[in-house]
Amino acid sequence: MPHLTGLRVTHSAIHGYGVITTRRFAKGELVLEGDGVLYREDDEFDDTYALVLPGWGADGGDDPDAPAVYYDLIDQTRWINHSCEPNTEIDSRYDHERGALRAWWVATRDLEPGEELTYDYAFVGALAQPCACGAAACRGLIVDADPEELAAVPEELRGHLRLAAGRAA
């Protein structure tokens, strides 16, 4: 795996392993680019470390009605943990030089050395999982905050959302 400049994989206070900064990153700065393998929505693959990139055709066409493609992370980016208050966001673009869809993590605020990188996994409601991010505005579940996705959260997990709403009130 390539070395991530300004970053280090280590044990995480959030969950398992994480990626921490070893230098300062400014808001809006590219923090890292992830390597991965593209799969179509109907392909069979292990999605443990996959990003969902809706609206991208496999040929790089930006089409909101296109089936989702999955970007299976194969480098250290797979260790970036979820947070309901993330400090990075993902920008995905088709790289015409490489002929591949790529994912970039961009700082959403200034990052100081020693901070763990996070992004919002924003799972669809049916795939929601309990969240342990520890953020002040934690939703209680790893789930997209869109009302349609929240409505699709399985009944047995809805109590986690009420707890999160109670903390936020």
Question: For each predicted feature, which ranges?
Answer:
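Catalytic cores of histone-lysine modification enzymes
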Residues: 1-93
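C-terminal SET catalytic tail plus cysteine-rich post-SET Zn-binding segment of SAM-dependent SET-domain
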Residues: 84, 89-169
